[in-house]
């Protein structure tokens, strides 16, 4: 019974404190998962000859190939943030801990969709002026399009999206692992990863509604941005009331001693 208090405390830590912080990230991953669809559709309307070329009969850089920029940005940004920016903030005495990193990352992912939404009407207008059929836009994936916006115009939204991912994804895994008790660390980390699947479920809920409403690409992106912003505020509220595990009162003496021993061996 004495050591059962340790388990009960870890159940409390996970269910009542970590879960409310993690659940709003389903809205974050809803946006991240949806970019592969929305941004590909946008790229179909753009000039795929981003490195030059005027041959109308061949495909240059297709949307799936252009999206590799996400991987390139991740490879660049993660080491910069972890190896230089976070230590720089610490040396300066700036409080940019895990919760604030996750908040910043969440916001940047929402912002990336707002950038895409602002660009969409101009891209569609330029595409329609060429006389091409919007319904067959996928057939023009990667093709040269005189008068269309270059696919490079998507670089800002990809950079902002990847910056958000680099801020919140590795930090979220670390946060849910360290802030959970020893017996719940695997469960807690898995729940963080599960939020990605919850994001896909949200897409399944909202996408048919937007399609039935006949929304344009830009309007749909604004709608997703608004929903993502709602999730962002949910996270901010949950984070504001969150108490770090080290500062939470223990259920009994055994739980307190176990926690002290754990933090004595863990640098965080």
Residue ranges, per PLM feature:
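Hydrophobic transmembrane alpha-helices of multi-pass solute transporters/permeases
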Residues: 1-268
């Amino acid at each position: 019974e004495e050591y059962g208090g340790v388990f009960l405390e870890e159940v409390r830590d996970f269910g009542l404190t970590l879960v409310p912080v993690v659940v709003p990230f389903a809205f974050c991953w809803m946006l991240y998962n949806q970019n592969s669809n929305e941004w590909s559709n946008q790229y179909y309307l753009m000039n795929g000859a981003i490195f030059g070329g005027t041959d109308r009969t061949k495909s240059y850089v297709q949307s799936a190939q252009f999206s590799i920029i996400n991987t390139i940005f991740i490879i660049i940004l993660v080491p910069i943030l972890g190896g230089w920016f976070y230590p720089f903030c610490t040396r300066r005495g700036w409080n940019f801990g895990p919760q604030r990193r996750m908040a910043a990352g969440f916001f940047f992912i929402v912002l990336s969709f707002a950038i895409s939404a602002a660009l969409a009407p101009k891209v569609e207008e330029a595409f329609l002026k060429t006389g091409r059929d919007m319904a067959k836009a996928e057939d023009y994936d990667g093709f040269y399009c005189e008068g269309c916006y270059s696919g490079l115009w998507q670089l800002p939204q990809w950079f902002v999206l990847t910056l958000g991912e680099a801020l919140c994804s590795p930090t979220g895994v670390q946060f849910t692992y360290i802030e959970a008790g020893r017996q719940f660390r695997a469960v807690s980390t898995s729940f963080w990863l599960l939020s990605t699947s919850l994001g896909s479920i949200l897409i399944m809920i909202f996408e048919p509604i937007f399609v039935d409403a006949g929304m344009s690409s830009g309007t749909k992106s604004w709608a997703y941005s608004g929903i993502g912003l709602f999730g962002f505020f949910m996270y901010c509220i949950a984070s504001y009331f969150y108490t770090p595990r080290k500062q939470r009162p223990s259920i009994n003496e055994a739980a307190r001693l176990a926690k002290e021993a754990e933090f004595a061996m863990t640098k965080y």
